Curated annotation (Swiss-Prot):
High-level lineage: Bacteria, Pseudomonadati, Pseudomonadota, Gammaproteobacteria, Enterobacterales
Record bears the keyword Oxidoreductase: yes
PROSITE patterns assigned: RHODANESE_3
Protein name: tRNA uridine(34) hydroxylase
Entries under CDD domains matching the protein: RHOD_YceA
Entry's EC annotation: 1.14.-.-
Amino acid sequence: MPVLHNLVSNEELKARMLAETEPRTTVSFYKYFTIEDPRAFRDALYVALTRLKVFGRVYVAAEGINAQVSVPASLYEEMKATLYGFHPALDKLRMNIALDDDGKSFWVLRLKVRERIVADGITDESFDASDVGAYLKAAEVNAMLDDPEAVFVDMRNHYEYEVGHFDNALEIPADTFRDQLPMAVDMLEQDKDKKIVMYCTGGIRCEKASAWMRHNGYENVYHIEGGIIEYARRAREQGLPVRFKGKNFVFDERMGERISDDVIAHCHQCGEPCDNHVNCLNDGCHLLFIQCPACAVKFNHCCSPLCMEELALTPEEQRARRAGRENGNKIFNKSRGLLSTTMHIPSPKE
């Protein structure tokens, strides 16, 4: 059977999505369970989700499924029922509905088979991914935040942590989840007897991280059920204080969900308070960075004068300049800061 996939251009698909009048619901979900034939599972799921006009990104692996999708609001319940009945392990699957949603998060459906649904780099065959830490619900999270014996650990990337996090949460300063796992084990060694509370966007990374910590001898390990998304939703529903500050970064066109009114990040170009992530407009760069409205005008939506200069060239001149250059300009590395003098990133105090 040929691989089922979309054949329409991204430009046309995006135009179709923007022209839609029916509201869409953005939702994420994941589940660790054994899939015997990931390719067959992927193809059957592609057919089922296409019928329901679902857009988004879905990863399938032998260890489970990880998805961020949008669906017409009128078809949400049908999609949920379809997933519940698709495999016994997906019955009553937790669905994390977006908190701050304009329905324009995705415009194409992509399902990919991967080695892992989260790239963890774990090769230890004795590792048991099912031996996870204890789940924490919203009220329990708030109680832990007031517990001096609890250490909150953010298992997201730097650019996610930068725009939003729990007060005093430990950042693991690595560019990838696979690098964070061994770093977390080392960084928390002095807190091994404390309560280790791990969290991430929707739960998938912190669940595996909690199992990794237990595998490495940590006993009092917890993780927030459903991640930041589920925590904020349940806290609001139950009338509890939402203790997460700032934005929750998301991996779609929205680039973030507003959780609180706090703006804790700063423009990477002028240092003014700002938490608006953008991609550099230069096709040879597309760096993800934080840019305020004033700097967007000043730098023509680019990350640096170098990219402004390149953007002003003809398409042929741009291609010639980019020839042989590896991985774009790499002006600002996500966790290691300034890599080029072409972009000044001031501290908040400057």
